[in-house]
Amino acid sequence: MIYTITLNPAIDYFITLNETLLVDEVNRGSHEIYKAGGKGLNVSKILSVLNIPSKAIAVLGGFTGQYIEDSFAKDPNIEMIPIPVDGMNRINMKANYGKKALCINGSGPVVNDCTVQFLLDEIAKINADDIVVISGSMMHGFADDFVTALAQAVHQKNAKVVIDMEQITMEQLKECKPYLI
């Protein structure tokens, strides 16, 4: 089984503005799209398109977390495993106007020890030869070495780790001993 882990999921809100962005003015949009995502969840989406099942572990909270979870509910190839967090998942806004874009990413909630433990409990359920993809950014509150600890927990189960993250150092990446980066 392939597991994907998304430590900082988001709702991406795309809007096309009718005119140039005006500061201190009301700007009107003509087209809006909401997409549930996060890098690990996007990996699960691609796997699903290829008809490959996956289990998507995602840290979710608030109405935004519920929206993200609901967005994957009807996909038969993705089993969503929500990890509860206090607060709301972030909303990232992308406003396109002309040939320019304004991108604003929310920060999201801060994880606590309970969230970390729920996540480690899910990792304890994986089997040998499973593949665990850790992808994207981390919410505030995760320890700097959390991904290393997560990778070590995966290795203890004789499973493979794939890492696609910007927030870890090369030294941490080496400690994770990834199967693929």
What residue ranges belong to the model's regions?
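Substrate-binding N-lobe of the ribokinase-like
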Residues: 28-88
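Hydrophobic/aromatic residues located in beta-strands of well-ordered beta-sheets
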Residues: 2, 54-56, 161
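Short glycine-enriched loops at secondary-structure junctions
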Residues: 7-12, 85-90, 167
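Conserved phosphate-binding/catalytic loop of the ribokinase/pfkB sugar-kinase fold
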Residues: 94-128
